[in-house]
Regions:
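N-terminal mature ectodomain segment of secretory-pathway/periplasmic proteins
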Residues: 37, 43-95
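Short hydrophobic/aromatic-rich beta-strand segments that constitute the beta-sheet cores
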Residues: 52, 79-82, 98-100, 152-154, ...
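Short acidic, glycine-rich loop/turn motifs
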Residues: 56-58, 83-85, 102, 156-158, ...
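An acidic-aromatic
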Residues: 70-122, 190-191, 196
């Protein structure tokens, strides 16, 4: 049997080490997409506009309610949801200030005084703006998928809030949010499908 010379053995070891490194890097790339990478990707987009269609299943009424309208956000902390159908409503949040409008009437309050709304707003706003600190403070967060197609599962850390909103799942492609699913503790659930407006997507 032909014996490897010391030089050849050295080359073989270096080649094996490089191959092992490539395999490890590939495995890390495939399995390592996490919240830090996702929020970094999302934070590059500083503003956006989209249309939405939402279907909400209300168990008490045994029916599904549909609505549609427009969404907008501006980093670092502004989120606007304007419902156009079946009736005009507007929800605008900047920082901790929530303004709700219905027709010509409007009401302004602190976001944290409306816990159910706060959980949903913070889940969507925090994801849109790539605010990892806010998401980690308020939720147990789990990312699945890849940078090209991902899902972010959020469960409120506060047990009292979890008694109202069981979980939120935000899904998207690249740096664009495309769907938000909300499961309330009473069994009601909603799915909001989001379509970026031309020129608004990254």
């Amino acid at each position: 049997m032909r014996q490897l010379t010391p030089d050849r053995r050295g080359v073989g070891r270096r080649l094996a080490a490089r191959l092992a490194g490539l395999v490890a890097a590939a495995a890390t790339s495939a399995a390592g997409f996490d919240l830090t990478q996702l929020t970094t990707q999302l934070a590059r987009v500083k503003s956006g506009e989209a249309t939405f269609t939402e279907k909400r299943r209300v168990e008490m009424l045994d029916r599904t309610l549909e609505s549609s309208g427009r969404l907008a956000f501006r980093a670092p902390d502004t989120f606007i949801r304007e419902t156009l159908k079946p009736r005009r409503e507007k929800l605008e949040v900047t920082g901790n200030v929530l303004t709700m409008s219905l027709g010509e009437r409007s009401r302004t309050l602190q976001l944290d005084s409306a816990p159910e709304a706060a959980v949903i707003v913070e889940a969507v706003r925090g994801t849109l703006t790539g605010n990892r600190e806010s998401l980690e403070r308020l939720f147990d967060a789990n990312v699945s998928g890849s940078a090209e197609r991902w899902s972010l599962d959020l469960v409120p850390r506060d047990l009292r809030l979890r008694g109202q909103v069981a979980s939120v799942r935000v899904s998207g492609r690249d740096a664009t949010v495309r769907e938000v699913q909300v499961l309330l503790a009473d069994g009601d659930r909603s799915t909001m499908t989001i379509e970026p407006l031309p020129g608004a997507a990254p």
